[in-house]
């Protein structure tokens, strides 16, 4: 039905002697609630629908007066001695006959007792069959929209509405109110709808403000008697039609209705309403997609946590684990049956504006093209829009139901990271598993370089120390290898070689060198502490605890507090307790605080670890490796900005500190600043091209920064091209 028909009505007159009518508000009522015949059938189905009886008296004497219709408007203006209260007390002060006489006097329009000025009635009273009462009631609701005044309904009799009728009125009145009061605020619209629903006793738990049968039994009796008197001159339906026609003539006829409606709800108003509906629909769909992505994030978060327990550094930096980690952090999402990079808030907002809000404005186009014939087409457009919405939602559900895990893994294999097929991912995963198993078998075995120009050098140890001091770590490692090949029992040579590999971001070689140093000198405290730190970096807690306990057991100051029998059953809590005792014995020992920081990193108590390292830095402020440990702990504690500051302190003390350069890049990447992280990885690799972990980090940042054009250079390890493209 077009809106013009709802507003203008047809040319035919009401059918005499019946309740059917072609008047616009009658049609509007039928459009909202269905025809009167259907309503009468529903009323007949309700058992005892018209039965009313006395209800329990649960109001006090004063509450009965305040609960009369309209009393909520009068209450702020009436004082305890006001004439309104005296009027009601007059009713209660007489006997039954006196009450009847007073009521007859009111009905006959006799002179009223002197009263102060009251509010003029805004809405008429309603009487007649339920369908006619409801039609008049909704008519008054529509009238309030034209006048722009708050809807203050008069009491209505019990209509016997079914639950489906109430639901229909609740839903449609809310929709129509937003059309009628489009130029008013949301608070006004809600108050209008609430007043309508409350008067019809629709909302559960809301006490109706209208007349409630049973509160005033005497007045109910007179009400029922007055309703039994039917005026003989006009049929009720004809009377209604006559009143409406007279009202239409008084207000200028149908044309003035259309003009008034267009003024209040013109083209722009409907375009705005439609735009809001579309925005809400899109938000709902986005929330549905977000829920699915949240579920995927939760599953991958559990998987990532399980995989992260593995200690192999190459597996920790594998592309498979990186993929799972990015899914768990929400950096990858499922969209249109594909795995895609999650857009930043600014990006999707810009995309939305370009697609839906860009010039020419779709709202203006909608207003010019779709509503060029006035408001009579709005009903058809609204029905069509609803059908399209439901179709779109069904299609989305059907598409998502077809999604399976294998599909999105295959899509990702060709997506953000840049591999050409899913087989590449499977092969890469198998490769890292093999390396993981091989790493366990060869753990502790030092691998010498194939080509070493320092073999045969007269003083390789001295040369290695000088190169290490200059920060040329790769060259220093070669010189120190030549030294330990010449003197295999040189514990200091092995120790310095292990330190060089650790600073060069190669913990596996560092551990192997330190183990050879321990074989040569089992009680060397620096070696034991370095082994504990390296195994902590490899997430090997049990082994790390063994070496840290060995450091305490062999220390001349603290050996007495470390019982020998504890070595058979090492627990983190016991070791931490012993080192806390040591810190109390000697608070000025920076090494004790360093070990405590390492222990708290093992238990992931990062705040306590940060405190321990900061205490140690107060004692050794120029220890660049200690600044690096603090930065790594802050990064693990999701304090990447603070970590960058700590790494910078380490680099200021030692500019060629490869591990600090790589860690700086990791901190930027953890903040989503992938473009900024790339130059730091390139700088670290320029100083140590053999740092496999740094190559993996660089490749990931290139992919996340959408620099697929440089991935080939990363794969071929073309440092010249990378340094030229990403200078620092």
Curated annotation (Swiss-Prot):
Sequence motif WxxxF/Y motif 4, location on chain: 348-352
Chain positions of motif WxxxF/Y motif 8: 408-412
Observed effect of gene inactivation: Peroxisome-defective phenotype including an absolute requirement for sucrose during early development, high seedling lethality, and delayed development.
Region (Amphipathic helix 4 (AH4)): 392-417
Keyword Ubl conjugation: yes
The keyword DNA repair belongs to this UniProt entry's keyword annotation: no
Motif placement: WxxxF/Y motif 5: 362-366
Motif WxxxF/Y motif 6: where in chain: 378-382
Taxonomy, superkingdom: Eukaryota
Post-translational modification: Monoubiquitinated at Cys-13 by PEX2 during PEX5 passage through the retrotranslocation channel. Cys-13 monoubiquitination acts as a recognition signal for the PEX1-PEX6 complex and is required for PEX5 extraction and export from peroxisomes. When PEX5 recycling is compromised, polyubiquitinated by PEX10 during its passage through the retrotranslocation channel, leading to its degradation.
Gene3D superfamilies per the UniProt record, alphabetical: Tetratricopeptide repeat domain
Gene Ontology cellular-component annotations: cytosol; peroxisomal matrix; plastid
Chain location of the short sequence motif WxxxF/Y motif 3 per the record: 270-274
Record-stated family: Belongs to the peroxisomal targeting signal receptor family.
Quaternary assembly: Interacts (via WxxxF/Y and LVxEF motifs) with PEX14; promoting translocation through the PEX13-PEX14 docking complex. Interacts with PEX7, promoting peroxisomal import of proteins containing a C-terminal PTS2-type peroxisomal targeting signal. Interacts with LACS7.
Role of this protein: Receptor that mediates peroxisomal import of proteins containing a C-terminal PTS1-type tripeptide peroxisomal targeting signal (SKL-type). Binds to cargo proteins containing a PTS1 peroxisomal targeting signal in the cytosol, and translocates them into the peroxisome matrix by passing through the PEX13-PEX14 docking complex along with cargo proteins. PEX5 receptor is then retrotranslocated into the cytosol, leading to release of bound cargo in the peroxisome matrix, and reset for a subsequent peroxisome import cycle.
Name under which the protein is recorded: Peroxisome biogenesis protein 5
Gene: PEX5
């Amino acid at each position: 039905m077009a809106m013009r028909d709802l507003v203008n009505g047809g040319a035919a007159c009401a059918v005499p002697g019946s309740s059917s009518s072609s008047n616009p508000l009658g049609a509007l009522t039928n459009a909202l609630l269905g025809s009167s015949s259907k309503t009468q059938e529903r009323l007949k189905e309700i058992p005892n629908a018209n039965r009313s009886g006395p209800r329990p008296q649960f109001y006090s004497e004063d509450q009965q007066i305040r609960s009369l219709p309209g009393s909520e408007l009068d209450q702020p203006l009436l004082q305890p001695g006001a004439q309104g209260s005296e009027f009601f007390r007059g009713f209660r002060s007489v006997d039954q006959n006196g009450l009847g006489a007073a009521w007859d006097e009111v009905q006959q329009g006799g002179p009223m007792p002197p009263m102060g000025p009251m509010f003029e009635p805004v809405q008429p009273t309603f009487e007649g069959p339920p369908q006619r009462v409801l039609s008049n009631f909704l008519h008054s609701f529509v009238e309030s929209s034209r006048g722009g005044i708050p809807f203050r309904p008069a009491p209505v009799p019990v209509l016997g509405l079914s639950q489906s009728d109430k639901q229909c009125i609740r839903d449609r009145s809310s929709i129509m109110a937003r059309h009628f009061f489009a130029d008013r605020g949301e608070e006004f619209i809600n108050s209008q709808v609430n007043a309508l629903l409350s008067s019809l006793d629709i909302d559960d738990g809301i006490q109706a403000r209208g007349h409630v049968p049973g509160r005033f039994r005497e007045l109910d009796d007179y009400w029922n008697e007055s309703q039994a008197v039917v005026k003989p001159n006009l049929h009720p339906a004809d009377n209604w039609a006559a009143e409406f026609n007279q009202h239409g003539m008084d207000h200028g006829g149908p044309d003035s209705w259309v003009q008034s409606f267009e003024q209040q709800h013109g083209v722009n108003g409907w375009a705005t309403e439609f735009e809001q509906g579309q925005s809400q629909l899109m938000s709902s769909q986005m929330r549905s997609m977000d829920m699915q992505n949240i579920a995927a994030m939760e599953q991958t978060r559990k998987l990532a946590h399980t995989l992260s327990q593995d200690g192999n550094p190459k597996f920790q930096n594998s592309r498979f684990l990186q993929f799972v980690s990015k899914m768990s952090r929400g950096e990858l999402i499922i969209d249109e049956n594909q795995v895609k990079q999650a857009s930043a808030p600014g990006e999707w907002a810009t995309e939305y504006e370009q697609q839906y809000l860009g010039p020419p404005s779709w709202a203006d186009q909608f207003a010019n093209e779709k509503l060029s014939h006035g408001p009579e087409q709005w009903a058809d457009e609204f029905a069509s829009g609803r059908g399209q919405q439901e179709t779109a939602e069904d299609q989305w559900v059907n598409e998502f139901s077809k999604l399976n895990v294998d599909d999105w893994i295959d899509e990702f294999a060709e997506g953000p990271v840049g591999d050409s097929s899913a087989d590449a991912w499977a092969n890469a995963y198998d490769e890292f598993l093999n390396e993981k198993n091989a790493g366990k078998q060869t753990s502790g075995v030092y691998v010498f370089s194939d080509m070493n120009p320092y073999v045969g050098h007269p003083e390789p140890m001295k040369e290695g120390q000088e190169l290490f001091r200059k920060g040329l770590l790769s060259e220093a490692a070669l010189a120190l290898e030549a030294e330990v090949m010449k003197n295999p029992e040189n514990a200091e040579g092995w120790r310095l070689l292990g330190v060089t590999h650790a600073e060069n971001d190669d913990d596996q070689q560092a551990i192997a060198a330190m183990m050879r140093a321990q074989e040569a000198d089992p009680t060397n405290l620096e070696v034991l502490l370095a082994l504990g730190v390296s195994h902590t970096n490899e997430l090997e807690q049990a082994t790390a605890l063994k070496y840290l306990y060995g450091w305490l057991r062999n220390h001349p100051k603290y050996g007495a507090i470390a019982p020998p029998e504890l070595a058979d059953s090492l627990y983190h809590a016991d070791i931490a307790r012993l080192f806390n005792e040591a810190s109390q014995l000697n608070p000025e020992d920076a090494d004790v605080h360093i070990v405590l920081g390492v222990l708290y990193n093992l238990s992931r108590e990062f705040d306590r670890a940060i405190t321990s390292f900061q205490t140690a830095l107060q004692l050794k402020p120029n220890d660049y490796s200690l600044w690096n440990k603090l930065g790594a702990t802050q990064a693990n504690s999701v304090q990447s900005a603070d970590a960058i500051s700590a790494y910078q302190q380490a680099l200021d003390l030692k500019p060629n500190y490869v591990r600090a350069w790589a860690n700086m890049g990791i901190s930027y990447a953890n903040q989503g600043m992938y473009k900024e992280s790339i130059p730091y990885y390139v700088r670290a690799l320029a100083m140590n091209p053999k740092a496999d972990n740094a190559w993996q980090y660089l490749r990931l940042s290139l992919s996340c920064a959408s620099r697929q054009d440089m991935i080939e250079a990363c794969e071929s390890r073309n440092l010249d091209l990378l340094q030229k493209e990403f200078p620092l």
